[in-house]
Amino acid sequence: IEERLVGSEMCIRDSIDIGEGFKYNPFWMFVFRWLHVISGVMWIGLLWYFNFVQIPNMPNIPDDQKPAISKVIAPAALWWFRWGAMATIVTGLILGYINGYLHTAMTLTLMGGGSPNELFIGIGMWLGTIMWFNVWFVIWPNQKKALGIVEADADVKAASARTAMLFSRTNTMLSIPMLFSMVIAQNLY
């Protein structure tokens, strides 16, 4: 397994390495940090919108107005939500690589030592990875059924809506320690 992990890391490193000028270059560090923050704001902002605004207020919306949300607003918001998640994880991994801490952070400093900064950024990266997985492989497939984007009977729609909501709530709870870990890594160490 370790050989596969090392091989995978080498493949990722080789695929994004566009020359030695890319790694540790302040310009690219800034560009990818900026893109990471912008895409993260999009992703987590929509996550919090769904959990703190849309879901709690759906019972207050008259039935004749609910299709406006389920057929127009929710699918558009979910597009930005899932692609915000994708952009966040991709830019975060690139940022970890060009700053030289990707391997140490992703192994939580267990392989090759590391600093508290790399440990905390690694915790944040793993929480973000779990959240990204939930978005793409649990929330989105279930939302497609719940919103009628793909065919499903009423029982499956209801079960899918509940599953998507529970995993969305899980991501909301994970977002707090994820953000804390990211901020502490950048500001205390």
Language model regions located:
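Interfacial and helix-entry/exit segments of alpha-helical transmembrane bundles
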Residues: 65-91, 156-177
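Membrane-interface interhelical loops and short amphipathic "cap" helices
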Residues: 18-34, 101-118, 189
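Single conserved hydrophobic/aromatic residue that forms the stacking wall/gate
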Residues: 1-7, 11-12
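Membrane-interface helix-loop-helix modules in multi-pass inner-membrane proteins
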Residues: 50, 54, 59-61, 75-139
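Lipid-exposed faces of alpha-helical membrane segments in multi-pass integral membrane proteins
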Residues: 35-38, 42-45, 83-90, 94, ...
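Juxtamembrane inter-helical linkers in multi-pass membrane proteins
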Residues: 57-68, 146-158
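Juxtamembrane boundary at the C-terminal end of a transmembrane helix
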Residues: 15-18, 181-189
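Functional transmembrane alpha-helices
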Residues: 27-53
